[in-house]
């Protein structure tokens, strides 16, 4: 029987698979994977995923649904996602508030224009996807470097989408920090403007300091102290939510990542410690 409570998670990456399979029970509360990277995967990787899914709850963070795209939603792909989520009893499914296809796959997460028209477009697609998947979706605030056309602020856009789509928010704390530095707004004021009830999970990750006013979200380094401080503020405002440490590149030994997940757990305990059900 899997534990009913989630707090501290780690991204499931193929490069970590041998160490994750040997990881002690309770080292983390859950693992998060991108379903696109594991659907129909067999062999040693498929067996490894099946073994981990028996030992740890699995959550999913999608990469290619392209909720903001202009092409029709891919219903066959959504069927595959739903089957994967059902097979592994996934309780939390999230996707990026972005688009990644336009007459082909772009292999990047592009920001959606901050307009009323875009709000209506993406909210309708989220509602249809939620209906097809028979579960709620948490959309993630993305990092972006070239600001899209904006008739409203990023905060106003996110709030409008959450309201019209009636979906949840995966709050990426590092992305808030990166965008605040790059686009000149206050990260804490941004968090204060988000609706508490919509935040159901969080991400935290490292970034690269290209310049004092240019941060790059890399997922390739340890979490920086300024981001830890912003995460503490997020816990204070939104309560303890399932939080994933993301690390995609320059993977260190698992023990180093578990030092960071232990810090997440300690901070969660200091901000109320009531686990998320």
Swiss-Prot record:
<dbReference type="InterPro" id="IPR007801">
    <property type="entry name" value="MbnB/TglH/ChrH"/>
</dbReference>
<protein>
    <recommendedName>
        <fullName>UPF0276 protein PputGB1_2003</fullName>
    </recommendedName>
</protein>
<dbReference type="Pfam" id="PF05114">
    <property type="entry name" value="MbnB_TglH_ChrH"/>
</dbReference>
<dbReference type="InterPro" id="IPR036237">
    <property type="entry name" value="Xyl_isomerase-like_sf"/>
</dbReference>
<comment type="similarity">
    <text>Belongs to the UPF0276 family.</text>
</comment>
């Amino acid at each position: 029987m899997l534990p009913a409570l989630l707090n501290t998670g780690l991204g499931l990456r193929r490069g970590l698979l041998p160490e994750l399979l040997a990881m002690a029970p309770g080292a983390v509360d859950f693992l998060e994977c991108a379903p696109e990277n594991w659907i129909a995967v067999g062999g040693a990787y498929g067996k490894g995923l099946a073994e981990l899914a028996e030992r740890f709850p699995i959550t999913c963070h999608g990469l290619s649904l392209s909720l903001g795209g202009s092409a029709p939603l891919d219903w066959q792909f959504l069927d595959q996602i739903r089957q994967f989520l059902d097979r592994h009893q996934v309780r939390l499914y999230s996707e990026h508030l972005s688009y990644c296809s336009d007459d082909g796959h772009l292999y990047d997460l592009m920001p959606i224009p901050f307009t009323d028209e875009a709000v209506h477009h993406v909210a309708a697609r989220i509602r249809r996807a939620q209906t097809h998947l028979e579960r709620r979706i948490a959309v993630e605030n993305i990092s972006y470097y070239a600001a899209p056309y904006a008739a409203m602020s990023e905060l106003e856009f996110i709030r409008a989408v959450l309201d019209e789509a009636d979906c949840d928010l995966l709050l990426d704390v590092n992305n808030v920090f990166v965008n605040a530095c790059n686009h000149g707004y206050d990260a804490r004021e941004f968090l204060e403007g988000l609706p508490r009830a919509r935040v159901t999970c969080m991400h935290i990750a490292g970034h690269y300091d290209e310049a004092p006013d240019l941060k790059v979200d890399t997922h390739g380094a340890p979490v920086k102290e300024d981001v830890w401080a912003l995460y503490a503020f997020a816990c204070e405002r939104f309560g303890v939510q399932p939080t994933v440490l993301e690390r995609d590149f320059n993977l260190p030994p698992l023990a180093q990542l578990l030092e960071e997940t232990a810090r997440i757990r300690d901070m969660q305990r200091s901000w109320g410690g009531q686990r998320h059900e």
